[in-house]
Amino acid sequence: MWNKVYVEEHLLETPRVKTLMAKIDHTPIALKSFDEIWGKSKKPYLHKRETLNLFIAQKKGQLLKLAPDAYGQAGEPHYYFIHAYNCIYECQYCYLQGYFNTPDIVLFVNHEEILLEMEQTLNQNPDKKVWFHAGEFSDSLALTHLTGELELYHDFCRNNPRAIIELRTKSVNIKELLKLDPLPNFIISFSLSPIKIGKAIDLKTPSTQARLRVMDELNQKGFSLAAHFDPIIYQDEFKQHYQELLQSMRDLKLTTILKYLSLGVVRFTKDVYREVERNYPDSLLHSTPMIKSFDNKVRYNHPMRMWMMNTVKELALEAGVKEDGIYLCMEENA
């Protein structure tokens, strides 16, 4: 899977990295700091298909970041924590293709420091629940069979009922997750697209059907689940495709148990949009005109976005999703 594996030299003899390297079975290349090489020169995003390198490093600087408005449900503070850079999947709309200078993966291993910062943040908000989201810069489950950090974050939730951790994912890699007990404040949230859309643009990801099967398995075992319909992309038979997706979820009794469902229409920064045009010139992402929007992102016009999200919201309500659990993600007046 990996072309080369780089490890920061001060981490080589640590137990966590030794365990990780034994699973990878790859001779590491030592370096002082991962950013001596990573991102120093432009590596085209699609080169990940042939030569994907792995860097194992210590995350320095800010370990938690305050999430922007409309990132999660309103009323409580939301942060995201950075456990990795880049993703093994290849979704045509992914903003990472214009965010970093390289698609190579970085896995950060200083989870105890991240958890300490979480604890400090929790103490700074003594009367509130505080949300911590994983999956902003990398899928939160895809490589957990290698990294083995889930138990640490699970224990943090067990010991801190006011903390809510959300693992955002498109993965069906739940091997490590199934070793843990369900907790109400340890939420696994799945990004889902209608089957036709997923096949067209969620490249190298588990299918929508596979994700639904995993959600069903986790639900049967009592795990807390949520879903993201984000990005919502317009295409012919748009309404029918979301009806079919929600019916599939309803058949598995998933719609009524969701902690929440977020709805967000496809959007890009200007730089990411240029990369998408370059990397996927024939994508259905380009089939509907977009404009520069309220936050300088490239999106469909406002009436169209509202119509799309309200259409999907009505379908979700009909399928049994709780109205107070549905919110609009990264949208004005959300």
Regions found by a protein language model. Give the residues of each.
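Active-site glycine- and acidic-residue-rich loops that bind
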Residues: 166-167, 234-247
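Conserved radical SAM core fold
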Residues: 138-141, 172-175, 186-206, 231-235, ...
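Flexible, acidic/Gly-rich N-terminal and inter-domain linker regions that tether
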Residues: 1-77
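Conserved Radical SAM active-site core
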Residues: 57-77, 92, 96-189
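Structured alpha-helical segments in the cores of large, soluble enzyme domains
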Residues: 118-124, 176-181, 208-221, 312
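Structural preference for beta-strand elements that scaffold enzyme active sites
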Residues: 4, 129-133, 164-166, 185-189, ...
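Auxiliary Fe-S-binding modules of radical SAM enzymes
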Residues: 1-17, 247-334
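Cysteine-centered iron-sulfur cluster-binding motifs in ferredoxin-type domains/subunits
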Residues: 81-91
